[in-house]
Design a protein with these regions (language model features):
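Juxtadomain coupling helices with adjacent low-complexity linkers
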Residues: 8, 31, 199-201, 206, ...
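N-terminal helix-turn-helix
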Residues: 2-86, 268, 297-392, 560, ...
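Flexible loop/coil segments at beta-strand boundaries within sensory signal-transduction domains
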Residues: 227-233, 523-529
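A short beta-strand signature within small-molecule sensing/ligand-binding domains used
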Residues: 217-225, 513-521
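Short, solvent-exposed recognition segments
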Residues: 4, 137-215, 438-511
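Amphipathic alpha-helical effector-binding/dimerization core
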Residues: 86-171, 386, 391-475
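Extended serine/threonine-enriched, polar tracts that run as long, contiguous segments within proteins
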Residues: 205-211, 223, 229, 235
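Amphipathic alpha-helical regulatory segments at dimerization interfaces
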Residues: 26-29, 61, 97-108, 159, ...
Length: 583
């Protein structure tokens, strides 16, 4: 079967997909270059060259999909967008196969270790095992570096053909200051001859490459290749240090032995998912996000189009669903290391084959996917997918993920909302969105209260394993904070049992007279309770029953949205700096 030639998509029926990807790239660029969490649509018009009406329709569609967030007149990336990058990472199999080796090397060497893959004439990071110090040295998953300014780049360039070298020279001529690479400090003037070609020849001869402060002063790194079954370099494992601990020569002496010792096992692990995929192809699986699809199901994009009208770009929504489906797990679990056939994609998304084919060919044309005629006629996502917001969104902390949903909750119920974690026998507030009232609850980040007397504390204690909960209660000596505080340990045990069954806790004037609080758990990807979300109100604003009826549904919805973002953001790496919660 021939797929036929790929036509330029911009003026075709899937032009909206290309325009949508352009808007996402510009949002990412602005977030990376300017540190702008949110931008005006006019900024996107200037950056993409698209008409304002087109940008508005693209943004409206992306908001409906949950990939961007609107706050007044500003547009920002939303954490759910990371599911597109997760599709590539799952399909590649690299985090699962090589992540444990990176962690082990980082532990043994006490340095940050990463894995990078070739992406055009650059190196893009896909695995990160960070050692955090005052002087932190690490790249983010999704960051793209120019090949000539990093150690992995020399290893990848050793296998370039003349066409790839010509593309590299053209890129350097067009972008001499590396403005297209927000992950590296921009050059102040065009670089003279970097000696890159000589370093590439040396890397091909020795089997390793070094970065001696090419990215920025103080940063040194050593990389070695990890090869696939055909002998080609599939990726590079990279150790990063600082000149306060190593120079390039001492780092090389310290890490090359341990790196080379791990390479055979890493290459075997990299081959294992591919062999398993050949032996047990399994069912195609369905896309992991959005409404369920499949044969006989209504296309979610069509339903949204019918509801929202001309402002909704159905081709954009379908194209992103197709991209997500390339990394969706099959029923046997895991990603799709050898990609998916056109038939499998159509079945996973519920789209007609012709519709799925158009989207796939557009993704191939734009460099987000490839078609392997000789490998089961499968489509695979490519590392470029990670340019769609993955690196800046990967920097978000747990509290930063939660804040947008907390703001929506406060707007809906007109009461203050807080997020807390268990810290010994106390709860500690890690995020808060207040409301404006004449009478309001005044609490700041870092505030601590006894867990036994708070709704969030009871939710968190109820989420402990039975043995942990019993040990906590055994060491408890509750004091009455008001005349309503439950202080009898057996009664507290019963309250926690009920909280666990009900999935919420309502505390009425036990912490402070006049204060009522309702809390629900926030669970990580493993379904453990990792935090609690609450709404605090004055006890005089209604009965406890009316509080439950009016506030609990909205509170549970907000918690579910936080959980969804937490699962997406932590699927392949820990959350960014800030308050860390297990997931």
């Amino acid at each position: 079967m021939s797929l036929g030639p790929v036509s330029p998509p911009v003026n075709g029926p899937v032009g909206p997909l290309e325009r949508g990807l352009a808007v996402l790239c510009e949002l990412t660029r602005l977030a990376a270059h300017q540190g702008e969490a949110a931008v005006r649509p006019g900024d996107l018009v200037r950056g993409t060259g698209l008409a304002r009406s087109v940008v508005d329709r693209v943004v409206g569609t992306l908001e409906q999909l949950g990939y961007v967030r609107l706050d007044g007149r500003e547009v920002g990336l939303a954490a759910r967008l990371m599911e597109l990058g997760n599709a590539y990472l799952s399909a590649s199999g690299l985090p699962d196969a090589l992540g444990p080796f990176a962690e082990r090397l980082a532990d043994g060497l006490d340095e940050s270790v990463s894995v990078a893959v070739p992406d055009g004439d650059g190196a893009r990071f896909v695995v990160q095992a960070t050692r955090r110090r005052t002087m932190s040295l690490a790249f983010r998953i999704g960051d793209l570096l120019p090949a000539e300014r990093c150690a992995p780049g020399a290893l990848f360039a050793a296998e370039w053909d003349e066409r790839a070298w010509a593309a590299w020279r053209a890129r350097r001529a067009a972008d001499p200051l590396d403005a297209a690479y927000p992950a590296v400090p921009p050059r102040h003037r065009p670089a003279a001859d970097t000696g890159f070609e000589a370093r590439v020849r040396e890397a091909a001869r020795t089997g390793w490459a070094a970065d001696d402060q090419m990215i920025e002063p103080g940063l040194v790194a050593v990389s070695v290749p990890v090869r696939d079954a055909s002998g080609r370099t599939a990726c590079a494992v990279n150790v990063v240090s600082h000149t306060s601990r190593h120079d390039a020569a001492s780092l090389r002496a310290a890490v090359l032995g341990p790196l080379h010792a791990e390479i055979p096992a890493m290459e075997a692990a990299l081959a294992a998912p591919a062999e398993a995929a050949r032996a047990e192809p399994g069912p195609p699986g369905r896309a992991t996000a959005g409404p369920a699809a499949g044969p006989g199901a209504e296309d979610p994009a069509r339903a949204a189009k019918r509801e929202l009208g001309a402002g909704y770009l159905q081709s954009l929504a379908r194209g992103l669903t197709v991209l997500r489906a390339l990394g969706a797990p099959g029923e046997e679990g895991g990603g799709a290391p050898h990609g998916r056939t056109l038939t499998a994609v159509a079945e996973a998304t519920g789209l007609p084959r012709a519709t799925a084919r158009r989207s796939l060919l557009t993704l191939v044309e734009l460099g987000y996917a490839e078609y392997a005629e000789g490998d089961g006629r499968a489509f695979r996502p490519l590392p470029r997918v990670l340019e769609l917001g993955y690196a800046p969104l990967g920097d978000l902390s747990f509290t930063e993920l939660a804040q947008p949903h907390m703001r929506e909750l406060v707007r809906a119920v007109h009461e203050s909302a807080s997020l807390a974690v268990l810290d010994g026998g106390d709860i500690r507030y890690v995020a808060r969105v207040p409301t404006v009232r004449i009478m309001s609850v005044n609490i700041t980040i870092g505030t601590r209260f006894p867990a036994y007397a708070t709704s969030m504390g009871r939710v968190l204690l109820a989420g402990l394993a039975p043995g942990e909960r019993a040990a906590h209660l055994a060491g408890l000596a509750p004091e009455p904070l008001t005349r309503h505080t439950v202080t009898a340990v057996p009664e507290l045990a019963r309250v926690l049992e009920r909280t666990g069954r009900d999935g919420y806790a309502l505390v009425d004037e036990e912490l402070e007279e006049g204060l009522r609080s309702l809390a629900v758990p926030v669970r990580g990807a493993d379904r453990r309770v990792v935090a609690a979300l609450n709404i605090a109100t004055h006890a005089g604003r209604g009965s406890a029953e009316s509080t439950l009826e009016e506030l609990l549904p909205a509170l549970r919805t907000a918690a579910a949205r936080i959980e969804a973002d937490l699962a997406t953001a932590s699927a392949h790496h820990p959350l960014g700096a800030g308050e860390r919660v297990g997931a």
